[in-house]
Amino acid sequence: MSDLSGKTIIVTGGGSGIGRATVELLVASGANVAVADINDEAGEAVVAASGGKAAYFRCDIAQEEDVKALVAQTLAAFGGLDGAFNNAAIPQAGLPLAEVSLERFRQSMDINVTGTFLCMKYQILAMIERGTKGSIVNTASVAGVVGVPMHGEYVGAKHAVVGLTRVAAADYGKHGIRVNALVPGAVRTPMLQRAMDNDAGLEPYLNSIHPIGRFSEPHEQAQAAVWLLSDAASFVTGSCLAADGGFTAI
């Protein structure tokens, strides 16, 4: 387990799935965690289980004032900012590209792209102001490195996240700030579990498209994210870590 004792990390989308698993592992690794979500009940439940090492802040990452407030509240609560896991996103049910409405396309871009940009912007500014050599991890997706049929707006958004990650790494390496992307394959999140409960064929299909023969559990993604956030990955920046069971290898 990575040692993050005394470090302060923001986790967006921290109320469930990969985000929740990452909060739990960060706390176990000694970090203070600012848990951000739009689901107050879920976010507060994560904090209640943290043993006093986490605080919940409501944040819609597509809203600039929310993101600015999240960073300010984190600094006020914990006295610094050492890293961030920008994990909040909105996946959507599959549609052929020409059937995607402009409203749906814009929603994907607002949350997945603009939200990630805003989070990085204010996290980086806070780190530079304090001279912190921090680490930022953005959740991309296999959809950020390959084309996934029927998910045009999500593929476009996650490709943008990968591009923003690389540019930020190049821009801010001179400040000692590392920026990387996590590239999960399918993950057993509550949303995916609901979909599998309604479609008996979905789980076998998802197992079949990952060479390792199964899809991921949230804690496996959390382990990858925490490694990237830690000093164990001190020479890793501008990279896409594919924790995808081999999905992008074929």
UniProtKB/Swiss-Prot annotation:
Any Pfam family matching the protein: adh_short_C2
Reaction(s) catalysed by this chain's protein: 2,5-dichlorocyclohexa-2,5-dien-1,4-diol + NAD(+) = 2,5-dichlorohydroquinone + NADH + H(+)
Pathways involved: Xenobiotic degradation; gamma-hexachlorocyclohexane degradation
Record-listed substrate binding positions: 141
Stored Gene3D superfamilies: NAD(P)-binding Rossmann-like Domain (3.40.50.720)
Keyword line: Detoxification, NAD, Oxidoreductase, Plasmid
A biological process term (GO) from this entry: response to toxic substance
One GO molecular-function entry: 2,5-dichloro-2,5-cyclohexadiene-1,4-diol dehydrogenase activity
Enzyme class, spelled out: oxidoreductase
InterPro entries on file: NAD(P)-bd_dom_sf (IPR036291), Sc_DH/Rdtase_CS (IPR020904), SDR_fam (IPR002347)
Binding residues for NAD(+): 9-34
Enzyme Commission code(s) on record: 1.1.1.-
Domain of life: Bacteria
Location of the active site: 154 (proton acceptor)
Membership in a protein family: Belongs to the short-chain dehydrogenases/reductases (SDR) family.
Described function: Catalyzes the dehydrogenation of 2,5-dichloro-2,5-cyclohexadiene-1,4-diol (2,5-DDOL) to 2,5-dichlorohydroquinone (2,5-DCHQ), a step in the degradation of gamma-hexachlorocyclohexane (gamma-HCH or lindane).
Full protein name: 2,5-dichloro-2,5-cyclohexadiene-1,4-diol dehydrogenase
Phylogenetic lineage: Bacteria, Pseudomonadati, Pseudomonadota, Alphaproteobacteria, Sphingomonadales
Gene from which the chain derives: linB
